Amino acid sequence: MSIQKKILSMTIGPVVLLGLLSIFFMLTTVRSSMMEEIEEGLKGTAAATLAAYDQNTGDYMESSNGDIWKGSYNISRSESLVDRIRDNTGMDVTFFYGDRRIMTSAVDSNGDRILNSPAGDRIVEKVLQNGEEYFSSAVSLDGVMNYGYFMPVYQNDSTEIIGMVFVGTNKEDKDAVVNGMIFGIGAAVCVAMILCMGVGLKLATSISRNIKKSRNWLRC
């Protein structure tokens, strides 16, 4: 191996390794952190939504006409509340009574609210049966994929679960933000790698040339 190649391997090799490690870090740690941030944002909005309903005194109950009430507050007519939350957070919210959607800010392609459809079996098992909070990266709202967070709703201070609150945000939009950040950092790392490789190449060439000159001088 020539002197120039040896010098290049010593200067450029660590740069390439560092760049690859940085890219791996971005694909794992950065993405994981962003997913945690999305989950926490959804969880916070779900808790705020639940608190907005729970502040009304009285039990959750179903009236003879099918409307769901919390004391004297008609949840089935709480359009202004869910729409205000959506406008303030950019997230859609849904109130489930049992496994049935009875109020939501989410609308279909015709602009109608997505109501009365049931939750999926896994969600029912996790939230309604086991009483767990549940985050999913694949919740479909009228064919549009969402990140979603589900939180059980209890009958006042009892252990009886009467339904759940859901908060979702468009998955494609969030992924675009995450991927954009990763691409930006990746591009910066690549530019830094190229610059360092250029400096290393120039340095290796200069050192190699000087060594050759020294050898020639010694031979003379």
What are these regions (language model features)?
Residues M1-T29, G186-C190, I194:
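Extreme N-terminal signal-anchor transmembrane helix of membrane signaling/transducer proteins, especially
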Residues E40, G44-N56, S80-M103, E132-E133:
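Short N-terminal helix-loop-first-beta-strand/juxtamembrane motif that initiates sensory/input modules
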Residues F96, V124, Y154-N156:
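Core beta-strand residues in small-molecule sensory/regulatory alpha/beta domains
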Residues T169-A188:
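Membrane-interface helix-start motif
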Residues M197-G198:
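Alpha-helical transmembrane segments of multipass membrane proteins
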